[in-house]
Amino acid sequence: MDLVKKGFQIPKKINFDVDSLTDSYGKLVVEPLERGFGTTIGNSLRRILLSSIEGAAVIGLRIEGVLHEFSSIKGVKEDVVDMILNVKKLRFRSHSEGKKSVTVKVKGPHTITGADIQTDGTVDVLSKDQYIASVDKGATVEMEITVKRGKGYAPAEQNKEENGPIDVIAMDSVFSPIKKVNFMIALLWRYGQMEAYLRRRQSVMQRQFLSNILNCLYL
């Protein structure tokens, strides 16, 4: 049965509202929609955005001279647990399929932020203002942060490398670049319109982002 010939409304427009688009917020408009299908597509879109869009996150951390997360570092204000929590908040964009390592090497007095992270060009640091730790005069901190692309959530046990170095601290990871999704259905004269409001953890390339959504929805 040809649904279009039967008058069934198939979405023809899926675009971001350019007037409200920022690095951390976007409004996605989908129209036209068959009456009664707005909530169905909205819920499906919300699930896809929160669990199926690929992003990059930290999966492991190695700090020179530290063997486990319950350690402290001489000359550093934060203990290792606090440093891990701060490193988890870092956001990256990776252009590589596999794991990538980025490094930090500083000498105090210094406040370590995302801007201190050195990369090889295949990984972009998006949260350069993210605070990591404060280092006192005379102290030195060297860190290696492992970044990987993925989808959804991965626990630390899954990120732990079998037979890997004992001084690498595995971390749980939230890969999704989307932090929050709400949607609203508007009933127009002959069809429905859905607006999805997205809060993003990091910048997402708009064209690639839309392509990923369409592939998942088969629209």
Predicted regions and their residues:
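Protein-protein interaction/assembly regions in multi-subunit complexes
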Residues: 1-219
